[in-house]
């Protein structure tokens, strides 16, 4: 889910995505990777376009682990980072099976809070199911500085989204009132 042309949230599996469009997108990505001779992870960021062409547009190709695949750190048996290393080192690839029915990844964008790690105790106490990953980058408003993953049953997708969004907001806004 994009907001202001920035990846804001990833929901796995994609809700309400028609199986034929998912299969067509999978085939297109595999064809592109094969034709380009890709070794390692290739992310194909797609936008669904119901009723137009194949039902999707390719927005971005990245020949590396990508923000849209960060959900794999907690939602897949093998993360995109480990899978990339396995591929480039010519090791057997790991399982791509999901460890839960659904995963929500919410990006943490920089705000006024400069001490992102100061929010950890609050997030861990309020949202024990949220897994926080911070990148160690300097904080600037709107810059991706981390993400939150939450996994669970697919029938709880609304709750997973709520937890991911609230946890990310706590990190972004922690201490903002004292800094104002």
Regions found by a protein language model. Give the residues of each.
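Sparse recognition of residues in long alpha-helices and their boundaries
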Residues: 45, 77, 100-101
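Alpha-helix initiation and N-capping motif
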Residues: 58, 78-81, 117, 157
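Phosphate-binding core of ATP-grasp and ATP-grasp-like enzymes
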Residues: 1-17, 22-58, 62-69, 86-95, ...
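Peripheral (often C-terminal) accessory segments that flank ATP-dependent C-N-forming ligase machineries
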Residues: 86-180
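A broad detector of short, well-ordered amphipathic alpha-helices
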Residues: 27, 31, 82, 162-165
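Short alpha-helix boundary/capping segments
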Residues: 17, 72-77, 159
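C-terminal structural cap/anchor segments
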Residues: 73-91
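Short beta-strand-to-turn element immediately C-terminal to the catalytic PLP-Schiff-base lysine
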Residues: 13, 49, 74, 149-152
């Amino acid at each position: 889910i994009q907001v202001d042309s920035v990846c804001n949230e990833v929901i796995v599996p994609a809700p309400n995505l028609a199986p034929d469009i998912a299969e067509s997108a999978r085939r297109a990505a595999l064809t592109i990777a094969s034709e380009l001779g890709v070794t390692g992870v290739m992310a194909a960021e797609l936008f669904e376009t119901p009723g137009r062409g194949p039902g999707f547009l390719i927005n971005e190709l990245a020949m590396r682990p990508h923000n849209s695949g960060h959900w794999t750190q907690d939602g897949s048996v093998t993360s995109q980072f480990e899978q990339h290393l396995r591929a480039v080192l010519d090791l057997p690839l790991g399982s791509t099976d999901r460890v839960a029915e659904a995963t929500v990844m919410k990006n943490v964008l920089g705000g006024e809070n400069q001490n992102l790690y100061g929010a950890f105790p609050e997030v861990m106490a309020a949202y024990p199911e949220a897994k926080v990953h911070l990148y160690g980058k300097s904080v600037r408003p709107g810059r991706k500085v981390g993400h939150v993953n939450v996994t669970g049953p697919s029938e709880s997708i609304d709750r997973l989204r709520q937890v991911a969004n609230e946890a990310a907001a706590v990190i972004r806004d922690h201490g903002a009132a004292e800094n104002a």
